[in-house]
From Swiss-Prot:
GO terms for biological process: photosynthesis. It comes from the Eukaryota. One of its GO terms (cellular component) is chloroplast thylakoid membrane. Keywords: Chloroplast, Membrane, Photosynthesis, Photosystem I, Plastid, Thylakoid, Transmembrane, Transmembrane helix. The chain crosses the membrane at residues 7-27. It is a single-pass membrane protein. Belongs to the PsaJ family. May help in the organization of the PsaE and PsaF subunits. The keyword Transmembrane helix applies. This is Photosystem I reaction center subunit IX.
Length: 43
């Protein structure tokens, strides 16, 4: 039961860190390439 409580307390923290990092990455991409539907360096 203690292991289950440890797992249930670790999973939200890891997911919050992951989604925070992903949101930050998307924000930085949109800062350098605003409104980019197609990236010019791929074509």
């Amino acid at each position: 039961m203690r292991d289950l409580k440890t797992y249930l307390s670790v999973a939200p923290v890891l997911s919050a860190l992951w989604f925070g990092a992903l949101a930050g990455l998307l924000i930085e991409i949109n800062r350098f390439f605003p409104d980019a539907l197609t990236f010019p360096f791929f074509s």
